[in-house]
Structure formats: structure tokens, C-alpha cells
UniProtKB/Swiss-Prot annotation:
Residues 11-164 form the MPN domain. It is found in: Cytoplasm; Nucleus. Keywords: Cytoplasm, Developmental protein, Nucleus, Phytochrome signaling pathway, Signalosome. Disruption phenotype: No visible phenotype when grown under normal conditions, due to the redundancy with CSN6A. Csn6a and csn6b double mutants are lethal at the seedling stage. GO terms for cellular component: COP9 signalosome; cytoplasm. The lineage of its organism: Eukaryota, Viridiplantae, Streptophyta, Embryophyta, Tracheophyta. It comes from Arabidopsis thaliana (Mouse-ear cress). Pfam families: JAB (PF01398), MitMem_reg (PF13012). This is COP9 signalosome complex subunit 6b.
Amino acid sequence: MAPSSSSGLTFKLHPLVMLNISDHFTRVKTQLNPPAASCATGNGSNNADAMLLQNPRVYGCVIGLQRGRTVEIFNSFELIFDPALDTLDRSFLEKKQELYKKVFPDFYVLGWYSTGSDATESDMHIHKALMDINESPVYVLLNPAINHAQKDLPVTIYESEFHVIDGIPQSIFVHTSYTIETVEAERISVDHVAHLKPSDGGSAATQLAAHLTGIHSAIKMLNSRIRVLYQHIVAMQKGDKPCENSVLRQVSSLLRSLPAAESEKFNENFLMEYNDKLLMSYLAMITNCTSNMNEVVDKFNTAYDKHSRRGGRTAFM
């Protein structure tokens, strides 16, 4: 396992970066993954190639900005990797960098991304090749393997540091912590992706069930995290764990940020909103009933007029 970073930088990762990397990997895997029949006819010498096709590596750059000691990664774009030379296509990188600079003049290249379970020695060669663009690039690694037991995001951010190993200074990867940062537009987009309709349209009941399932999962995870936090505080009160003032301050700040559900103003606003919803439902029902009644009256008048004209002609004849 890579050691922890000592740079003191704070990293903020936006969901758009993870979506771009995941989409990039999915597209490449779909294009390169051979049919099952051709895989079955291959010999043992092609097992390594088959594994590479099943789990291809993708590469790209991450862009964003740095404010003081805070590095915020906003977006990413794809790069072309030359497996023969084990390097990135620099001309393509420079063209993409110029295009993104026109659209996002405040953003610059912070580093690069790839997919895999862990950083490798070949990754360090790519990392060093990007140091002429950014002297301290970051490496965002997404693990595409599905692990249902893992609750954290399969994303690791690495920095490079010089460490003396066996008397020789070497550059090694050190992993650093990060937080997920979102803006309103990203929250709306992620929520839209999470609630996409099925290809056949789906029924209202199916969509409602999926929505309620998502809410239930979120509440279940929130409940488990609150239980862990509560048990930790109880252990500190009993003296089983050392008292951490930083944790207590964060818990106190979290509790103060929650709205007071028992205040008079909250009850007043709740009742007002509740009555407004009832009034809207009542007006919608009245409008629907009025529309149905008008249709019945129109049909009755049409049928009565035809009967009257038919009866008149019969009497005249």
C-alpha cells in the first residue's frame, strides 16, 4: 500500500470527473470486448490479451484550479495512449489543452487519470512525462472492478514525492485524501442519471418504486453512519476512547446546521405549505370534475339534438 501524502494539500473532486472516467472505460471496453465465441476458440497464449480486452486501461487529463492549498478537480478529457511507445500522444494533448483553455480560461491541467486496481511502475513514467505541464501533477485512479463489500468510492488520488530508498532518491506515488465537492448543476445532473427511465418507458408505479428505493437506501446509509457516530461519542463519554475535540466540534457543527423541527416558525410554515398542497389538490379535483361534466353535457346535447331532428322529420312526413 502506498504511503500517505505529506504535502498538506486539500483535494476536492467533482462527480463529473468520475462520470467521465467511468463513461470512457465503459465505451472502450464495449468496443474492444470480443464476442464470446471468439474468446472460446482462443488458445492459452492469448489469455493475457483476452484479460486486457476484458479490463482495458484508459487515460486522460484532469483539469481544475488551485486556490492556495486547495486543489479542486472540476473536469477531465480523454487522451490517446500509444502502447508501443508506452507514452501519451503529446500533440493530441496540446490540441485538447488549447480547446479547453478557450472554453475554460481559468482551468489548467492538474494531472491525469487512468483505470486499474493500483498504481504501477509504468504509471510513474507517464506521470514524469506530464511534469513539464504541471510540476506537481496529481494521478486519479479509478478501479472499475465491482466490490459489493466496499462502501467507499473506488477512486484514489496520488501525488508523487521523492523518498530515499536504499540510499537512492526515487519518485514514488503517495495517496492523499479527498472530499467530494458538488455544485447545483452537478447535483441535478447526477440525480437525473440516477433516475433515468427504462428503454421501454416504464410505468408510473415502476418509477415510483425506483424513487422510493433510492430514498430508502439513502436513509439506511444515513442511519448507519449516525449509529457509528453515536457509538463513538458514547465510547468517548465512558472513557473507552480518547476525547477528540475536533470530532466533537464537527458533530456540534453538524447538529447546529440541522433545522429545528419543534419550533413555532417551523410548525407555521409546515401547516401553511400543507394547506397549500391540499388546496391545490382540491382545485385540481374540481377542475377535473368540471371538465368531465362539460363532456357529459356536450354529449347529451348532441344526442338530444339528433333525436329532436329525427323526430321532427318523422312527424312532418
